[in-house]
Regions:
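FAD-binding beta-loop-beta segment adjacent to the flavin cofactor pocket
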Residues: 21-52, 176-192, 200-216, 223
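Iron-sulfur cluster-binding cysteine motifs and their immediate structural context
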Residues: 207-273
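Active-site-proximal substrate-binding core of FAD-dependent oxidoreductases
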Residues: 16, 48-54, 66-118, 231-236, ...
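Short Cys/His-rich Zn2+-coordinating modules
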Residues: 192-202, 230-239
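Flavin-binding catalytic cores
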Residues: 1-21, 41
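C-terminal helical "tail/cap" subdomain of flavin- and related membrane-associated enzymes
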Residues: 73-173, 184
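Extended, non-globular alpha-helical segments
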Residues: 20-34, 38, 111-123, 272
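Extended, hydrophobic alpha-helical segments in both membrane/secreted and soluble proteins
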Residues: 36, 42-49, 58-72, 85, ...
């Protein structure tokens, strides 16, 4: 996209100073979980408070943090012993502007899952945004999890995309981009990207998806390394490898892995990308 004449004319002469990635929680209103649990609460992006059409969630994150803080203070002052449950946070959330805002746009993202596809979604979303404004008696559902939408390489509609080599001006190679995140993890700590069975994962995923992890990861964490010789690579000719120190915590793997056997967990030392205001 950056090489499109319009965008390249804007970006030319500039300097890339940072890089980052984060998977968007597009579930919206329909996917808000129970936000309180014994001794804690879910706030912000953890609870999925992103306004998907606007791709904005800072304001809802801040508001949910304020609501949780108020509920926490009330719970701690009223209950001096036992487990603290933030029931007041659940109630305050439903009476807040967060709930009202997300409910108003709840049908926009699911509307793209229709027989008319993109065109149908655009038409319905426009109707919702400018006329209906969420004041409808129905709530559209998401058809299924994101990972279930991944097609195998054998599917007729799947074609290989060949991208041009990065020019070092507008586009950059992956390792250069990762270096701009400032990410760092201690090499000797347990891998925080947990795979139930590495060999089984490779046997199951590589023949069907031809190294999907290589393509959806924006930091080069996952690799299928070529291995030749009898008995190597389980007959696939490749070995599944995780470069966890490169991880920038976008959580795409946890969401998109077709077999759902990759689990992102907090690194032992709490490390990760060092983002800063640019």
């Amino acid at each position: 996209m950056k090489h499109h004449p319009f965008f390249s004319s804007v970006l030319s002469g500039g300097k890339c100073i940072s890089y980052g990635a984060r998977a968007l929680n597009e579930g919206g209103f329909q996917s808000i979980p129970k936000v309180s649990f014994p001794g804690g609460a879910l706030i912000g992006d953890t609870a999925g408070f992103l306004n998907v059409p606007k791709i904005k969630g800072t304001h809802t994150s801040m508001k949910s943090g304020m609501l949780a803080a108020e509920a926490t203070y009330a719970a701690l002052t009223e209950n001096t012993s036992g487990t603290v449950m933030l029931y007041a946070y659940e109630d305050a959330l439903r009476a807040s502007t967060i709930w009202k805002e997300l409910k108003q746009v709840r049908n926009m993202r699911p509307s793209f899952h229709n027989p008319l596809g993109l065109i149908g979604g655009v038409l319905y979303s426009g109707l919702e945004a400018y006329i209906l404004k969420g004041r409808v008696p129905w709530t559209l559902k998401h058809p299924g999890p994101d990972h279930a939408a991944t097609l195998p390489v054998s599917h007729p509609s799947v074609r290989k995309i060949t991208y041009p080599k990065p020019d070092g001006i507008l586009s950059f190679d992956l390792l250069t981009s990762v270096s701009r995140t400032g990410t760092n993890h201690e090499e000797d700590q347990p891998v925080h990207l947990r795979v139930k069975d590495w060999r089984a994962h490779a046997r199951r995923e590589f023949p069907r998806f031809d190294g999907l992890e290589n393509r959806f990861c924006p930091a080069g964490v996952y690799e299928y390394v070529e291995e030749e010789g009898e008995g190597k690579g389980d007959g696939l000719g490749v070995r599944f490898q995780i470069n966890a120190q490169n991880c920038i915590h976008c959580k795409t793997c946890d969401i998109k892995a077709p077999s759902q056997d990759i689990e992102w967990s907090t690194p032992q030392g709490g490390e990760g990308p060092k983002y800063y205001m640019t």
